[in-house]
Structures are given as C-alpha cells and as structure tokens.
C-alpha cells in the first residue's frame, strides 16, 4: 500500500528535531527549474498569482531568492516535520516511533507543487507553491503541465515493487489531479470522512483534513498493507460505515463533536 498526502501551507522550521538519515528529493533538479521561474516575479506578481497578502508575498519572494540547489540540515528540514497543517496535526509524526517512521518512508508520499513528490524524510527548503497555481513554465501554462507524467511514473515504479499494490488517496483533489490514476495499474482507494452535524452526516473540511492524517498514522503505526484492514480505523471516534461504503470509497463516520 502506498499513501499520497497533500502538503500544508503552514510550515514549522523553528522546532528542532533529530533525524539520523534525512534523504534528498527525487526531483530536486526539476524544482530548480521552477525556482528559476519564481525568481523572475516581484512581490506584487506573487501576491496576484497566489492570492497572498503583501506580507506573505514578500516572505515567499525571499524564500525563492534564498533557495539553494544544495540541501543541508541548515537550510532544509525533513518534509514530514516541516509541514504543519491539519493533516499533519492528525499524523503527529513527533509521537511516532522509529519503526513507524521507517514504514512511512517506504509507504507515504507527499505531493508538492514545487518538489513533485516527497518522501517523509526528504529534506525540503521552505516554499509556497500550491499545485493549482497557474505558473507559466518551460512545459506549459501550469504545474500540471510541468510535472506531466513524472510524478505518476515515480509512484508507479514504487507500487510495482509491492506485493499488493494499492494507492490510498488521502490527498486533496487539487493535488491528486497531478496523477494519471489509470497509468498506475492498481486499485485506488479514496476514503470519505463524515462528521455528524445538526442530525446529518457531512464532510466538514477541517475535520476531514485531520482525519486523512489520522488514517495515514493508523496505517504506518499498524504496518497495514491490505486495504481490508482499513476498516478497523477507529482513531478520534471514527468508525467504518459499511452501508454507505464502496470498495474504492470506504466511508468513516463520527458522532457530533460537543
């Protein structure tokens, strides 16, 4: 089983960590090509392109300027520790043991507008570049054109080494669109997380994002490789709901939060 996650907008480069053997991004040379395009932009261009405040635009122009082709522990941080949004709050890497993190390194991939795809322990320099950004580049009008089949090919090679190749899609639609699922030659499972509110079950964005991280955590903690075992997911009160589930879209529900 291979999990794909979205990245997060929020980053944490302040909290110190200890990682014995960080790795390097597979597509660092491709990232450098995008950085070259981003370095051409003034703060007002970045603000308009990414719908950012002037303050955030200035921050990210500085990040593009300082980005280096050489990744070190001084200018980078392993991706799974650097991302700090709802998904990563649910995943809570800081409380995982070494064996779980080792499993994650082999079975979790983070999709990224700048880096294409990252392993959890890949060193990552701070950036802001969402996959849906219409950044013109050497390959086309946006990042989907830039990455083309590269990310898909990377995941396909990895899935080809697994006894039971299955892709567990815990990424957002914006990021999953960078993949060509039919080319992966394996089942794709996309769980649905619903919370009770006002007597009805519905997808609530904040809770659903966190639940994706929780499920990724559940998989790596329990070394799950068989999709059938996902039905046991029970973190934070979620339970498998068979009546509304499909093989490729299992539904997990939770009672209303009080």
Curated annotation (Swiss-Prot):
Disulfide bonds: none annotated. It comes from the Bacteria. Pfam families: H2O2_YaaD. One of its GO terms (cellular component) is cytosol. One of its GO terms (biological process) is response to hydroperoxide. Belongs to the UPF0246 family. This is UPF0246 protein Pnuc_0753. The lineage of its organism: Bacteria, Pseudomonadati, Pseudomonadota, Betaproteobacteria, Burkholderiales.
